[in-house]
Every structure is written in structure tokens, then in C-alpha cells.
């Protein structure tokens, strides 16, 4: 591992020395590809044994969504977690052997949301130190990451945490690159760009792919892509997670400074100690999770608005709804009656491919 770390340090130093311009873009692209490969070795060490990615650190996923809290010590993370869970929790705090504490599951707008403290991520974890690797395996399964910062010293810490997560292949508040990539048996590298490219040319693309021993592939660039974008697509193990920056301790700054913070994207200022602005934070969490609540209506009865079936926004068809309740339900499915925003008239008879919207009411009719 130490030789891998030494190689990483060497490449990072060379990248820092290299001026960024058209002439060096090709060389930098190569260095970035080498760096990505070395980082992957650290995260998934060779040998295959060793208990897998989450050795001794397996946190059962409960509820409808999972939020990971990341932050340096003494930024008020524990206070925020316990106050949020204390105010909005229906479940007592519970502990995991190697995780400090998990304050539990909060219930918000009918959804159960699991809160996880992710310790040790930011202490050189991406370099394989400590238990960082196991923690990251859990972080990658989160639906949302909250980076908790001290409002009096946010910027330096923000960058360190972002770099640490980036090093693990976690991409915050970004979408997967719009790049088509398909390996083939022969024919060399075939590059197509549907729009002008400011960084990638045929030579750079070929050299990055050669670093991965790929000499035959079709590559389609559908947006102005960077070397990092191409590497992310080739690596294929990146996760794209929304992130909110929680700026704590606003009781120690002026109103003018608070106004400036409100203009920063993806930010919510709070005081964990005084429980200030928790409503704003919860509302933003809800917006970023994009959960879809579906209410059930048994035949001849009123809809049950107390316990919705909660679906992730990427899987909201009637079939997804049935699978969430029980996998046998889809076998007995005849059609569904739906009331709500997803239909033109109430109720409307729909099939299993119909896409539901938040707060729709559904009645399943069996064969």
C-alpha cells in the first residue's frame, strides 16, 4: 500500500507542477488516468479476501432513504444529529459496533429517513488509512450526503471533504457525463463529438484509453467533456449523490454575513445548538431526496393518508409500487385505478407501466 501511496503522491506533485494549457492537456489527461487507477487499487485492494468492502461495518438499510453526515470533529455534527433525531424521531437511538452512533430514523412527510454519522471519512480515508474504506462503502449507498461545516471556517474544510469523497468515486451534485462508451474487438478508437470540445481531442482520448489497455472502442462525446469525465465513464464505478452543505453555528455571525451565506448554492445555515432553521433544512432534504409518496385505497374504503408507500423518484411505475408491497402482487395484477396528478381524470384505469406522481392515490384490482 505504501508504494501505491508514494506513486499517488508523485503523480499529484507532477500535476501540481504542470501548467494547465492546450499543450499540456494530453499529458495531464494521462496523469489523471494513472491517478484514478491507483486510487481504485487503494479502495479495492488486490487479493479479493479481507471481508469485502464493508468488513465489520455493515449498516442495515432501513427506511425509505439514507442520509450520510460528514464533517470534521467539533463542527456540531453530533448535536445536529441528536437534535434532529430527538425532535423528529419515532425510534430510539441505536448503536453499531464500529460506528459511533446512529441517532435513528426520522419521520418526515410520511417517509422514514435513516440518518448515519460517517466518522473517519476525512482523515486520509481515501489513502486507505483507518477504517475509512469501510465507511466509504456505506457512504456510497447514501441517497443524500450532508456536509456539516463550521460557519466560521467553512471554505478550507469544504474543499478537503469534497476531495476525500471525490477520491472514492463519489460525485456530489453532478450528473453522469454525457459520453457514450462501448468497447469492441477491432477497428481502433472511433471518436465522435456532437459538439465542440475544449479539452479532449482524438490523441488525448486514445492515450487515456491506452492507459486502461483499451485500443478498440467507440466513444461519443455529447457535451463539452473533460479528461476527468472520460475517466469516470471508463472506470464505471462512480456514484452520483446529491449533497447539502449545512453551515452550523450561525448564532455567532452577523445578519449581513447570513445574507451572503443564503446566496451560496446547496447551502443551509443552521444553529444545531439552538435548533434554528431546522424546518428549512428538512424542507431542503426533502427536495433533494425527491421521494414520491403513494397512498393506497382499499376497494370501497377511503384512502389511507397516514402511511404512504414511498418510492425513489427513479422507480415510480405501478409495477415498482407493487414490487415494494410484495413481489407476488404483480403476478395477480389486472389493472389499477389512480387518482392524482399523473392522470387526466379521476379515477383513471392504468396498466403496470404507468408512472405515478407524488401523493397519487392508487387502488390495485387483481385478476
Curated annotation (Swiss-Prot):
Domain OBG-type G span(s) in chain numbering: 65-290
Per UniProt, activity regulation is: The GTPase activity is enhanced by potassium ions as well as by DFRP1 binding.
- Look up keyword Magnesium and say if it applies: yes
> Which keywords label this protein?
Acetylation, Cytoplasm, Disease variant, Dwarfism, GTP-binding, Host-virus interaction, Hydrolase, Hydroxylation, Intellectual disability, Magnesium, Metal-binding, Nucleotide-binding, Nucleus, Phosphoprotein, Ubl conjugation
**Which tissues does it occur in?**
High levels in skeletal muscle, heart, and kidney. Intermediate levels in liver, placenta and brain. Low levels in colon, thymus, spleen, small intestine, lung and leukocytes.
As for family, the record states:
Belongs to the TRAFAC class OBG-HflX-like GTPase superfamily. OBG GTPase family.
Q: What is known of its domains?
A: The ThrRS, GTPase, SpoT (TGS) domain is not necessary for GTP binding nor for the GTPase activity. It appears to play a regulatory role favoring GTP hydrolysis mediated by DFRP1/ZC3H15.
Name of the protein: Developmentally-regulated GTP-binding protein 1
Name of the coding gene: DRG1
Amino acid at each position: 500500500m505504501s508504494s501505491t501511496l508514494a506513486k499517488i503522491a508523485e503523480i499529484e506533485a507532477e500535476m501540481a507542477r504542470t501548467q494547465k494549457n492546450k499543450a499540456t492537456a494530453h499529458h495531464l489527461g494521462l496523469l489523471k488516468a494513472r491517478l484514478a487507477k491507483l486510487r481504485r487499487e487503494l479502495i479495492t485492494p488486490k487479493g479479493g479476501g479481507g471481508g469485502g468492502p464493508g468488513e465489520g461495518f455493515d449498516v442495515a438499510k432501513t427506511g425509505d432513504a439514507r442520509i450520510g453526515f460528514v464533517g470534521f470533529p467539533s463542527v456540531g455534527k453530533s448535536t445536529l444529529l441528536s437534535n434532529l433525531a430527538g425532535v423528529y424521531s419515532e425510534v430510539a437511538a441505536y448503536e453499531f459496533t464500529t460506528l459511533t452512533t446512529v441517532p435513528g430514523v426520522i419521520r418526515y412527510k410520511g417517509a422514514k429517513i435513516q440518518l448515519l454519522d460517517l466518522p473517519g471519512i476525512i482523515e486520509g480515508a481515501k489513502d486507505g488509512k483507518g477504517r475509512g474504506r469501510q465507511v466509504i462503502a456505506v457512504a456510497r449507498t447514501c441517497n443524500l450526503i450532508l456536509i456539516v461545516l463550521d460557519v466560521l471556517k467553512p471554505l478550507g474544510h469544504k474543499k478537503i471533504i469534497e476531495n476525500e469523497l471525490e477520491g472514492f468515486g463519489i460525485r456530489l451534485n453532478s450528473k453522469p457525463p454525457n459520453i457514450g462508451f462501448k468497447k469492441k474487438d477491432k477497428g481502433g478508437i472511433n471518436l465522435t463529438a456532437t459538439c465542440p470540445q475544449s479539452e479532449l481531442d482524438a490523441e488525448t482520448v486514445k492515450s487515456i484509453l491506452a492507459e486502461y489497455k483499451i485500443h478498440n472502442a467507440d466513444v461519443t462525446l455529447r457535451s463539452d467533456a473533460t479528461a476527468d469525465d472520460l475517466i469516470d465513464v471508463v472506470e464505471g464505478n462512480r456514484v452520483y449523490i446529491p449533497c447539502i452543505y449545512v453551515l452550523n453555528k450561525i448564532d455567532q455571525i452577523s445578519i449581513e454575513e447570513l445574507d451572503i451565506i443564503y446566496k451560496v448554492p446547496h447551502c443551509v445555515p443552521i444553529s444545531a445548538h439552538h435548533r434554528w432553521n431546522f424546518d428549512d433544512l428538512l424542507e431542503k432534504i426533502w427536495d433533494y431526496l425527491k421521494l414520491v409518496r403513494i397512498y393506497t385505497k382499499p376497494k370501497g374504503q377511503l384512502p389511507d393518508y397516514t402511511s404512504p408507500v414511498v418510492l425513489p423518484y427513479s422507480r415510480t411505475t405501478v409495477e415498482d409500487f407493487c414490487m415494494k408491497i410484495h413481489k407476488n402482487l404483480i403476478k395477480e395484477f389486472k389493472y389499477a385505478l389512480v387518482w392524482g396528478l399523473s392522470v387526466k381524470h379521476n379515477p383513471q384505469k392504468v396498466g403496470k407501466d404507468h408512472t405515478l406522481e407524488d401523493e397519487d392515490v392508487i387502488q390495485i384490482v387483481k385478476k
